[in-house]
Regions:
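Residues forming the flavin
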Residues: 1-55, 60-206
Length: 206
């Protein structure tokens, strides 16, 4: 089964994406016939260096061959996740949106599953009339954690099993996501634009 803390699958995935279909071709070879939300093929890549908020100049594409996306698609990751959940459910996978994993179940010092969060509690964590305790989900073979690099269960696992012993320290960056609605006259379908420079200072790459 799959547990998703968001109220709907893909609800926390606000990212657009330039998508290479290799893995999807292997996983679901007939994804086009199944109307996957992978429609807009990349037609052109532009590379821009931003000097400031008004001035930029183009970088020849041959200087950065890894930035070329011929044959790839421009997609919404959230929409793709929703579609993948439908394919999984059609195969008999139980998908539970709105059920975050809250605790780890251990058996013989191994991960055996998780317990979902309690439902029907107030802001202070006190049970309301609609209270329902979390459910135990026991895995048949394996439990896969996909909660991000600093999830609370991940931190518990790292500490318990010394997963960071002898490893380089993790590094983090802060990212901000926004969804913009752009007038059709102001964008070109199939265009991928890569930028660097402003607003970052010269001594900060990105």
């Amino acid at each position: 089964c799959v547990l998703e803390k968001s109220a709907e699958i893909g609800g926390h995935i606000l990212s657009g994406n330039v998508f290479q279909t290799t893995a999807l071709d292997e996983l679901i070879p007939d994804w086009k016939e199944k109307d996957a939300p992978v429609k807009v093929e990349v037609k052109k890549d532009l590379l821009k260096f931003l000097v400031n908020e008004k001035l930029s100049f183009s970088i020849p594409s041959f200087l950065m061959p890894t930035m070329q996306n011929h044959g790839n698609y421009i997609i919404s990751l959230g929409n793709l996740c929703r579609w993948l959940s439908e394919q999984a459910e059609a195969l008999g996978v139980d998908v539970f949106p709105g059920f975050p994993a809250a605790e780890i179940i251990y058996k013989d010092d191994r991960v055996a599953g998780v317990i979902t969060g309690d439902m029907g509690v107030d802001a202070e964590g006190n049970p309301k009339d609609s209270f329902q305790p979390g459910m135990e989900i026991i895995a048949n073979e394996a439990t896969v954690f996909a909660e991000g690099c600093r999830g609370h269960l991940g931190k518990e696992l790292i500490k318990k099993f010394s997963l960071d012993k002898g490893k380089d320290p993790q590094h983090y960056g802060i990212g901000f996501k926004e969804i913009w609605e752009v007038d059709n006259d102001l964008h070109e379908e199939g265009l991928v634009m890569h930028t660097n420079g402003w607003p970052l200072p010269n001594d900060t790459p990105g």
